[in-house]
Amino acid sequence: MPHLLEGDFFHSLELFQILEKTPGITPFMAVATLENKVVGQMLVILYQRKSLFPPYLYTHAHAYGEGLYAPDAEQNAIFPLLLRSLTIHLHKRLCFYIEFSRMSKKMLGYREFRKLGYVPIAWQEIHNSLHSKLPQERLSDKQIAMIKRMKKKGISCREATSPEDIHRYHQLLKNYYRLKLRRFVPDETFFQKLSTSSNARNVIITYKDKVIGGYTCIYNQGNAFLWFSAFKRKTYIHLHPDTMTIWQALSDAQEQDAQHLHFMDAGLPLKSNLYREFILGFGGKPVTKFRWFRFYPKVINLLLHWLYKD
């Protein structure tokens, strides 16, 4: 493999190596070179999925962002080549659907995606600014009082670095996402490998040594990205584990000097979304961008084109 570019964890050699050691996941990296130098690279993650409904076994590919490019590279010329290469490769592998999210600009790559049969779906993303105000300055007096009250009750947090803590956190994630069919929780190996990276933190929220919440945050390009989060909201409703988990993620991001905390998944693009409304309560800013989807069965793409005419 040629000497790859550095600067975006989601398209890095480090993440590629973590993913290739994780059962149930296959990473693919498209690389563009010019005069034996890498000028662009794009990482896509292929997940092996199971479903109670047809298709019972399928694969789903996800790319986070448009890739990474050399400072002097012609991104507008290289991006279509990388996108086409990965799309053709995944199509040959009968990948059920491909998804691109976290695009830096709403209209970036619009023409290229359309040419390859992708469908744009308007998706609301949320981020909290940490550089202009402290996180607590965006909270209501009621929220601040509640957080102080929960801390007095004994709720604490720590980074999950030991195998035991990571196992308990992984069990929490699996139970939390069990009925959320669109979300995929990687094998425990993934979180073990992430815990050794300087770009990632797995954090657990505890009460009397019981894990009631947790999250995985990626620190990348001066920002924080909340990749996974889970909490036992119903079991410990009196302890508000959902609020304590999101609040801790915001506090940690601010301590790490992140400019923003981005929620990588604020829920489905429905008019009424309780989770989205919940995280907006922490002072976040909603921004509508496109997520791009391409399904292997052409009939699904045709249906989506009809439903999401832009």
Which ranges hold each PLM region?
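Conserved acyl-donor/pantetheine-binding loop and adjacent beta-alpha core of acyl/acetyltransferases
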Residues: 46-65
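Short, polar/flexible loop-turn hinges at active-site or ligand-entry regions and domain interfaces
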Residues: 69-76, 133-137
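Aromatic (often tryptophan-rich) hydrophobic motifs at membrane interfaces
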Residues: 31, 62-72, 80-88, 196-298
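Divalent metal-dependent hydrolysis catalytic cores, especially in the metallo-beta-lactamase
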Residues: 94-102
